[in-house]
Each structure stands twice: as C-alpha cells, then as structure tokens.
Amino acid sequence: LDYYNSYVIQPMLIDVLSIMKKHEVEGADFYDVQLQRLIRYADQQEKMISPEGTYPVLGRSMGYRFGAFQVLAQVSWMKLLPEHIKPAQVRCALTKVMKRQLIKGTFDKDGWLNLGFCGHQPEIADRYVSTGSNYLCTFIFLPLGLQADDEFWTAKPEEWSSVKIWSGSRD
C-alpha cells in the first residue's frame, strides 16, 4: 500500500481524460467512470484523517507528507465532494493534518523543507527522493484555486468524519 493513487495517478488521469473529452478523443468516455472513482477515493481519504490530524503512514515516498491528500484537495477544488462531505470539514481536516505535521525541524535554517514525514527525518526518504520531491506536499493547497468567497473558505468550521465518529455523533 502507498499513496501513489493520490499523489499523481488518479488526479493526472482525470486531468488527461478531461482534455480527451474536451477534444472528443477516443477513450474519453472513461472520464465519467474515473470521475466517480476519484470522488469515492476523496470520500475515503476524508475519513482517513483522525481527530488528531494523523493518518496511516505507509508505503513509499512518505516524505511527500500531506501531498498524500491530493485527491481530496483536487475534488474539493473541482467542487465535486460527495453530498455528505461539506467543504468546511475538508478545510478543517486538511488544516489539522498540516498543523500536525509542520513541526520543528520541518524547515531548514533557510526555510526549505527538510526530508521527512513529520519534522526532519532523512532516514525515511527513499533513495530517489530529493529535497525537490518534498514539495509534492503542496498538492494539499489545490483549494487555493477557489475564490476567496467560496464556501470552502467562508463556511464556519466543521468537524470531519472521524471527529464525528469517534465522538459518538450520529450525524
């Protein structure tokens, strides 16, 4: 298991299929199927974020940090979240993840990201990972493409799924 379906595979596939559909290229009919898969994966990702802002650390490329949530961020940016997931709960969940991971040691003395998952942990970096690879974590910022008055930004804070579930909420 790893997060490569979120880092690049599913997001890039939907982007390519979108262009294919726009230009009526053969195979573009797969767009609708893939879009439903992307939305389902975003739904699963939202539930993976614990009340504390942690999530399973698994697979390779752990140094990409919260870039693991590219699918959730992209589906939010596309405004295609499932009905039961509100944009504000995604905003709050992703913010909690970032606050949890951006601890002392995350940045070097010049302000560049250090290798690691939570702080400076070069030993977790795969041999193909460089300092530049760290910046795949910026995928989490895709919602910055939304307008400032978008519900994602303006709605009051809302608990995300695992917070509700672990508190015994029935909502």
Name what the model sees in each region.
Residues 142-171:
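Extended hydrophobic packing segments that form well-structured cores
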Residues 2-115, 122-149:
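Long, repeat-rich segments with strong aromatic
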